[in-house]
Amino acid sequence: MSRLAWTDPAPLEVERPRLPWWVMLPRKLLLVASPVIAVLVVAMVLVFTARRVRRYPLFLIGTATLAALGVGHSWWAPVTLLTALGVVGGLWAWQYPDSFARTVVRQIRSEWRRAQVYAWRWRRVMLFTELTKRTGQGLHRVHYPHICRVCADGWRDRVSVKLLHGQCADTYATHADKLANSFGARSCRVRVDRPRRIWLDLVHTDPLVEPLAAPYLAEPGTGVDLARVCIGHTEIGRPWMLRLLDRHILVAGVSDAGKSSVMWAVLRALAPWIRCGLVQVFGIDPKGGMELGRAQRLFQKLVCSNGIEAVELLEHVATLTRQRAEVLRKLGTRKWSPASGQPFVLLIVDELADIIAYQPDNALRKRANVALQSILSQGRAPGVCVIGQIQDPRKQIIDFRHLFPIKIAMRLDEPEQVDMVLGEGVRKRGATAHEISEDTPGVAWVKLDGRRDPDRVRAFHSTDADLDELSAYVAAGHNQAPTLLLPTGKGAA
């Protein structure tokens, strides 16, 4: 281009300054309205101060108290107060470490994380991830989601966010990876709190990385709550309570994902009742008994194949289910209870697909499907629970996943399999079962029917020594079960 050629300068892009509307009022009107304006200004200052104190109560109240003591008395007053607080805090942390960490350490960490991470980056991150809304031109027309609360638990930060109009939880779930990277977290999960309010769980470390040792066996005769069977821990440190009463459980995962850890943890928790006959366990292990045969004495009957014996056992339990339902109906009882005089029946099927999908005999495969679906659809009220384990959760393999109210997804191969097991859209809400490490067998995501959000859990790990102890514990009992209703036929329908 010639040096003499003329180029138009870039247009000057400036924003016209916008003054408050009340500045434009006549001077006399301003003089008359000055008391009202003063009250409004004071109210705004008070609201601003109250919001800051609510966000950083420990820091602001503590700083104000120390400053007031220093000004009103002398330098030794705040020093004395700090020394006394340090001594009291040390004794508190020594005697009650969990309470101190939950009350003091969490509050300090939360205020620090909010000030150091989220207060500085929030608007920029919202702008760059396109989670803002515009109502016109200029910076003053940009609306940002509002941070309501920050709770730092150490391994994760929980950020409560007030949504803008026109936004929903899925809007943030779509940008979860961007939010995690922006705030320096490993992952971000989105949970719905209430209308226009969500929680962002920004995870920094994995609290379930260490295996969980199997608990001690309960004393013989100890009661068992079938509605709350402890089989591990959740991600937030609480016991993982699995409901067996009125439920069926589907466990899906690849090889070596730790599917059997769920089964053995359940049997270990039920050991006192298995020992005395209040719980009867039936098992099918198509792998020749390589897994369930390790503690064969726990089972009322164990079939180690996928042939005719396995199908007959399914039909046996299906007939038992119908007969028990008939007895309960005549007694005027809608649900099974230990007072009915009948044991709780637990059916465990390892490698479920070998029986309902991979069985080469079409007649046996059809009979197995009919019997199993009959148990799943009718067995909840009569006190029959099914735990099915499967590697391939595709619909072509098992098309009645909806009959399992509790679904557990352990490590899976593909992202699409997560939604197959747990339900549509669960992966967007953070249930990344396909990202579970191979070094953490027993870690899983569990989804209950009727609940929107899944939970991340880890089951107890049972060693060979634990299984030997469990088998000996059950065998040492009298195992005198109440009289079973004997099936009169083999059909399941």
Question: Which residue ranges define each predicted feature?
Answer:
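P-loop NTPase catalytic phosphate-binding loop
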Residues: 3-109, 218-330, 342-419, 426-430, ...
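N-proximal, solvent-exposed amphipathic alpha-helical segments enriched in charged/polar residues
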Residues: 100-143
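Phosphate-binding P-loop/Walker A region and its immediate neighborhood
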Residues: 119, 132-139, 154, 164-278, ...
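Short edge beta-strands and adjacent turn/loop segments
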Residues: 135-158, 344
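Short, hydrophobic beta-strand segments
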Residues: 152-163, 354-358
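Conserved alpha-helical scaffold flanking the Walker A/P-loop in AAA+ ATPase domains
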Residues: 333-339
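Conserved AAA+ ATPase small/helical "lid" subdomain
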Residues: 433-467
